[in-house]
Amino acid sequence: MPEVEVELAERLAERLDARPSIGGAEVVSWRFVLGGGWTLRAGLKAGRLGGPYEAPAAARGSGGGVYLRWSDGQCSHGSLDSRSPDDFGDRLAEWRANAYSDPDAPEILPPAPLPKVRTADPAVEAIVDGEPTLLIAWLEQARLRLARDGMARVDAASSVARSWRFVFNSHGLRAAYPETSASLYLAAEELYARSFAKRRLPTESELGDLLEDVAATTPVLGWPTTPPLGEVPVLLAPGLAAGFVATFIVANLNGAGVYTGRSAFSLEDFRRGRQVMREDLSLAIDTLLDLERAASPVSAEGVPGGRATPVQAGRLVRPIVDLKYARRCAFPPTPVPGGSPAFLLRGAEPLRSAEQVRSQLQRGLQLHSVLGLHAQDAASGRYSLVAPHAQVIRGGRSVGRAKVSLSGSFFEHLLDPRTELVAFPWGLNPGLLIWTTVEPQA
């Protein structure tokens, strides 16, 4: 652990432990999360193969947030950076100026045993500390592979990062651990994109799969064709399927929405175990996935990492709650993933592969992206979306692209016996095969 970052966190904790005061109000308890480190990036400039690479760039940064409880019962939230200990008086005045009253404000948690999970890859740390040649090598490999198939327009970006995270509080919590990340984004002809993002480097197999998928899928999406219309089987790729689940299920599991009545689900629904999916489907949260972005031993509030199952065998079990809404809803606080996957959609039956599903579709679509998912009414479960580059499947083969609109109820899809989880070669979450209404778009 770098001495500079350790000293920064310890100095800040020392100042807060001294019970500083503003206008007669003292800080009586506190917690903060602080992080800092290096990021290296490179890319293909202007999105054109054969042109100059975007020069590798290095950036160093630090930041975080603090939560204070004052002697007069008020609370404050504030931001942190590397200057916070030196400018402590001014920062404290800012935090006090933003103080507010909240009868349900969360208490500071005492330290608890933290689970072990790998959050850093030494191979990534070595690249950040040394030469970023691997970032260029990934881009060159992508350039050569796609150029072989005549693709002339590509956007690509690669990055690696190493950092340190400190979660301290006034009750003695002193969690400090390293983090790393590695990512590669590749898009071709403004038609199709794939990415890799974990806390570790990609394997040669993972990198090869990404390149081959982009090389194989992009040409198909370059051929305009007529889409199937009406009620159609539509295969949602994993990233898009996760977007639907996040929008219509995870958003409605949020404790704040449940408590205030803005969710499709009520507290009573959780108490009685309302069925919201088929019995063979479950949704879990897991922060103990080694070297995934989700990996995290402790949240910013001091909640230990772990596993939780908000939906088990299709039935509501517990909302997703922070400390405040854990108290209000009378459910235990939820472990907080450090990144993706934010949740895991699971089925009880073995999954067919995407290739198997496509080969058996006489008429259907595969979707990689849609427009407007974030703007849908999550509480209703209903959607009306446009897919500008829908992959048309006819006779078990991908035959081109079409622009379509699709509409339906995602709640109904998750109860439909025809809905199917589908295994893809990448990611921890599956794709989804749903039956939905498809109409043409000009």
Regions found by a protein language model. Name each.
Residues 270-442:
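Dual-mode signal for accessory low-complexity, basic/Gly-rich regions
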